[in-house]
């Protein structure tokens, strides 16, 4: 976390702390009314101290910040949004469909990726005429910027895009022994997509993301493969403050 991001997080919690602590001043006959300058300063100082402690605890043990550098998740996430990511989430629960997940990239890249989880282990997956079908059911996806302009299908132990299998030297496609069935996503593997479907470098290009252990194939075979966490809040800029779904 950069100093600027930490300052933003502290300011966010300070604003919340001040907001919940404001109380109407009692009206006393003959009194001038209103808090003194010293009281106001003490209140704000208290808020920033508490906010700082809360922020330090969270970034040490629970959450991290994530800066959005690209438009692959538009409209849900905008370029320069700063998110809070729950690093505990997947220590106690499995990733769920439609979660917005931060994870190490399965291709060489200096930065973690953030995408939406569309397919989980055991799912069948197909994209036809711009519609995503999971386990044979068309998905309702109000979050997508536009319909995907490619055809895709998980079958024959491969991911086929526009009728061609992904190159196993460039994409993470586990060996057949890891698949429970030729048309179902393998154990430990997830199909990730950006909400900005036609401007997103995601699983239709680099194959599956993996949630544990090491990558089983592709250019990062043997490297760490575990989800970093679940994004749950846009906290900066303040005019975009919202919980993520």
Where does each model-flagged region fall?
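Soluble "head" domains of membrane/secretory-pathway proteins
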Residues: 2-31, 35-41, 66-67, 75-245
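Short, basic/aromatic beta-hairpin or loop at an interaction surface
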Residues: 51-62, 72-81, 165
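Transmembrane alpha-helices and immediately adjacent membrane-cytoplasm interface residues
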Residues: 38-67
